[in-house]
């Protein structure tokens, strides 16, 4: 079989051409542009076996990005493995909003909480060259953060802390950006049949999946500076409940962030109702 034929085979297994080329890049250790240029080239027996083995894994529900061990986020390639969630395009809206708030407000103490692969915090450090703290309860996740930090040459801008939420974070914070686990058990059962991603990074506990998010907000009230912000992601259907809880705890709801499909994806919450203290304009979203 030649390259074109195995790509067509992959399409029959519900992969698109780009995904098939990414697998071929991994196997042939050749850039996809060169692979395309040699589309009629025959594969060796070993290469074909490796390719079909990867297709078999994907058909069994293993995400392609765990096979590739990489995923692009905010225009940056991040290494990953089965111990961290695969960065989502939807989450880029958090990182983009965080960049705006950090620059407009001159925030210096920045935390990416429940950081996973580090894609949010490292993207911030990469683009604005400010120090960012990245924290997670999973030591295996933090090993990936360390790998990505070195890969991006961001060592002098990054502090990595092993912590159960905010327990081991010292001092006041200007901004917390967090994409915590927020699935409930029912959602997790459905998702795990498809995605095979780490339960610890997905399960938010509680009937509504928001127990961890509520713990974060409870702890953040004491850890944020007087003018501090928290940007917290959730599922679209959870946003109202999370906002109501935050307001009861004394946060001001400054903005709801929407993804490109116009779904409510995250909240920006502040310590004070007086938004004029910040050097930016928020669109109030009641």
UniProtKB/Swiss-Prot annotation:
Residues that bind S-adenosyl-L-methionine: 136, 179
EC category name: transferase
Cross-referenced Gene3D superfamilies: DNA helicase RuvA subunit, C-terminal domain (1.10.8.10), Vaccinia Virus protein VP39 (3.40.50.150)
UniProt keyword annotations, A-Z: Methyltransferase, S-adenosyl-L-methionine, Transferase
Stretch forming the signal peptide: none
GO molecular function, a single term: nucleic acid binding
Residues annotated as binding substrate: 179-182
Pfam families, A to Z: MTS (PF05175), PrmC_N (PF17827)
Catalytic activity: L-glutaminyl-[peptide chain release factor] + S-adenosyl-L-methionine = N(5)-methyl-L-glutaminyl-[peptide chain release factor] + S-adenosyl-L-homocysteine + H(+)
EC number: 2.1.1.297
Taxonomic superkingdom: Bacteria
BP term (GO), one: methylation
UniProt keyword Ligase present: no
Functional description taken from the UniProt entry: Methylates the class 1 translation termination release factors RF1/PrfA and RF2/PrfB on the glutamine residue of the universally conserved GGQ motif.
Family per similarity comment: Belongs to the protein N5-glutamine methyltransferase family. PrmC subfamily.
PANTHER family: HEMK METHYLTRANSFERASE (PTHR18895), MTRF1L RELEASE FACTOR GLUTAMINE METHYLTRANSFERASE (PTHR18895:SF74)
Descriptive protein name: Release factor glutamine methyltransferase
Organism name: Borreliella burgdorferi (strain ATCC 35210 / DSM 4680 / CIP 102532 / B31) (Borrelia burgdorferi)
